[in-house]
Amino acid sequence: MSIMETQPQKILRSGWNAYVNDYAISGGWNYNGEVLIICDAAGGIYVFDGKSGEVIWSQGQVHEGGILSAAIHPLTDRFATGGQDGKIIIWNTHQKKREKIIDLGDGWIENLSWSHDGEMLAVSCSRTVYVYTKEGNEIWKSNNHNSTVSNLGWSINKELATTCYGRVSFFDGMSGKVKQKLEWKGSLVSMVLSPNSDIVVCGSQDNTIHFWRRSTEQDSMMSGYPLKPSALSFDETGSYLATGGSEEVTIWSFKGNGPEGTSPLSLKLHTKPITTLAFAHRGMNLASGSRDGAVVLWDLKSENEESGLSETSVSDSVSKLYWRPDDKALAGLDKQGGVTVWHV
């Protein structure tokens, strides 16, 4: 893989910034990029006009104890939030309206994920996974996993992937039947599926990355990380995987027979550990954020082309980076409650 980096260029241009009342932990752009939805750790929701940054509506303490997770519907004006109160709320984006409240009782709602077609919402609460229709009606729930469910993700074939200690499981999205189990002794802290859903990659508590090819169930491990690789992102083609786990962004090539037997590319500019990574929806732009608030946009090129980059910063540790659906804007959230949007 031939990717190089040059000196910073002016690729990221200032857009707008705002503050929410606590740690900005999750959210995202709505399906058409007109609004940006942000949730803070105290349980507040803020819906911003995507162009101006003006608050369309906000509401505090929607979950007692705080919000833990949020998921933006991929095709319609609704989103879901989950909290420490054991509740999932499905909201109307523009009308400040609760369309459905689901109460699972005791337990934290740590993960939410919409299927790619938006027809199903997956929820994890402790060791159990629930799947609902987009209106919030239960379709099925799983038996208990081996441990707390740490990640959720949907394949393009309407399969739900889950992680817990020692296992990745794939469920049929409609029936809840277990279709595949991929096992490895270790605590899996992060997960990403390749765009074609054949490769599943997990960051592990032991500072390694483990991945499987689902078609063969062949597994491999990539070691040498000083920290837990909690940030993972595939490019749109599934050819390149960006990983955190240190102050460097490590890029593995899945082209040909890779990454086995190949050396990764290390992108060196951050001085503190990587906290979040996000490839653009199209092309090879990669955004990275780190613990000191630095945000870098890498314009990666292959085939011996150089890559430009642009560096900026936010107030504190970067919690999330979200590309607008058209990739012409990037939103960054930080630990101090800062919300920053740049034009690309």
Regions found by a protein language model. Name each.
Residues 50-52, 93-96, 133-137, 173-176, ...:
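Short loop/turn segments that connect beta-strands within beta-propeller blades
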Residues 2-22:
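A short helix->beta-strand "capping" segment at the edge of beta-propeller domains
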Residues 36, 79, 121, 160-161, ...:
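Hydrophobic beta-strand positions that form the internal "hydrophobic ladder"
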Residues 31-32, 74-75, 116-117, 155-156, ...:
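Residue-level detector of Asp-centered blade-edge/turn motifs that repeat once per structural unit
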